């Protein structure tokens, strides 16, 4: 095997069909191509031209070099110790390149799974625990910890974290902080005694479908603290980039690997236990209540968890069933303690919103609970009064009702 690769793979004529593909798709193809080129010591363009030449010359199937090349490459990947899924992905990408360049491939024997190394299935015991997360998170710099908390409490993927913005964070939470300038808003949101849930619209990377991402109070506190930390950095000159989680995903991967080794968390399913995607799995496993409590109020269904992480709806369901963000927020408030690491929270429905507060029995929180209760009762009374007015108007008719209103206003 000699090393040779195309100087500018992305510009290769063979990859024109990938022009409008996502970054992830392009990355997946490039990984397979580089291995294929390196193994054969030829560029992908040379390999495709060779196959097209054989096709033009009508070489019999049993003498085709392209078949030998693909099968030899498959054997190399097996001997290299790659797992079944990775080998299958690489092979499918290479075959796809040939076919997209009008090379007709004859029947190829499917990959024999018995020849391939298989990783152990990841079980519940392999999922990170709250105690393990509480050991690892304080060892991260604040901006890195903020990204981790978005995955832990929001179930976001490493890629989805890239699309959160400071502007959305400030504006969508303005109803709570009610501050005019960004720094004052961040200071309020960074205060642990001001817990709020943030719900924001994102697009799931895999499917391209929008969904409502929900981040818990601890994630909001940490993100706000991280932005204040960034604001004070000399290199930022007291400015803030609009990218909310200002840590590159490759940096996140590297730091998680370092911490996994440092803390001795080991591996599961052939991968480190402490890695970005494992934080998303923690959210999916724990938020359903399966790890902590079997009380009815702390349990939600698998379908509801799927919807929180942007999965689950078919195209038909997505056409007819529209997600109510308020319902999603209430649902999250019910189970937020399942993915909270340092605090316990209570929640209260107020009109069309849900407010959360620390459940610590301090004087300040008792006062807050009392205020929330009074406000909730007042809103309920107004709602009942509004319903009675509507009923009266329906009974009397619009004309009589308007006359009564005019008389009342004139009398006052």
Tell where the protein language model's regions lie, with residue ranges.
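Alpha-helix N-cap/helix-start motif at helix boundaries, enriched for small hydrophobics
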Residues: 29, 94, 147-148, 159-164, ...
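DNA breakage-rejoining catalytic core of tyrosine-based enzymes
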Residues: 116-135, 189, 207-218, 234
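Basic, Lys/Arg- and aromatic-enriched nucleic-acid-binding interface segment
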Residues: 130-162
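Conserved tyrosine-mediated DNA breakage-rejoining catalytic core shared by Y-recombinases
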Residues: 164-222
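Short, polar N-cap/turn motifs at the start of nucleic acid-interacting alpha helices
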Residues: 170-171, 272-273, 293-324, 329
């Amino acid at each position: 095997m000699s090393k040779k690769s195309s100087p500018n793979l992305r510009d290769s004529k063979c990859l024109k069909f990938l022009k409008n593909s996502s970054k992830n798709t392009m990355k997946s193809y490039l990984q397979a191509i580089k291995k294929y080129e390196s193994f054969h010591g030829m560029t992908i363009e040379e390999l495709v031209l060779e196959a097209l030449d054989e096709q033009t010359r009508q070489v019999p199937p049993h003498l085709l070099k392209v078949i030998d090349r693909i099968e030899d490459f498959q054997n190399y990947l097996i001997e290299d110790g790659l797992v079944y899924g990775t080998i299958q992905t690489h092979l499918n990408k290479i075959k796809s390149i040939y076919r997209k360049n009008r090379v007709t491939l004859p029947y190829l024997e499917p990959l024999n799974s018995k020849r391939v190394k298989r990783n152990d299935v990841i079980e519940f015991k392999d999922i990170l625990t709250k105690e393990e997360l509480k050991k690892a998170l304080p060892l991260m710099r604040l901006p890195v910890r903020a990204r981790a908390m978005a995955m832990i409490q929001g179930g976001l993927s490493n890629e989805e974290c890239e699309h959160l913005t400071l502007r959305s964070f400030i504006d969508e939470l303005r109803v709570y902080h009610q501050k005019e300038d960004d720094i004052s808003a961040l200071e309020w949101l960074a205060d642990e005694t001001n817990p709020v849930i943030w719900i924001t619209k994102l697009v799931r990377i895999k499917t391209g479908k929008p969904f409502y991402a929900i981040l818990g109070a601890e994630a909001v506190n940490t993100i706000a603290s991280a932005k204040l930390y960034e604001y004070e950095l000399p290199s930022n000159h007291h400015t803030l980039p609009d990218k909310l989680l200002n840590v590159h995903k490759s940096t996140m991967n590297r730091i998680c690997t370092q911490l996994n080794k440092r803390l001795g968390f080991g591996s599961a399913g052939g991968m480190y236990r402490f890695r970005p995607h494992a934080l998303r799995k923690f959210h999916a496993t724990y938020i359903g209540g399966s790890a902590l409590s079997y009380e009815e109020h702390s349990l939600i269904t698998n379908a509801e968890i799927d919807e929180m992480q942007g999965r689950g709806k078919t195209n038909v369901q997505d056409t007819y069933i529209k997600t109510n963000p308020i319902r999603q927020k209430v649902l999250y408030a019910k189970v937020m303690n399942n993915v909270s690491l340092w605090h316990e929270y209570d929640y209260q429905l107020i009109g069309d919103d849900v407010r959360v507060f620390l459940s610590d029995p301090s004087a300040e929180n008792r006062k807050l609970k009392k205020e929330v209760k009074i406000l909730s009762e007042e809103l309920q009374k107004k709602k009942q009064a509004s319903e009675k007015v509507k009923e009266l108007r329906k009974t009397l008719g619009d004309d009589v009702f308007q006359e009564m209103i005019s008389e009342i206003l004139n009398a006052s």
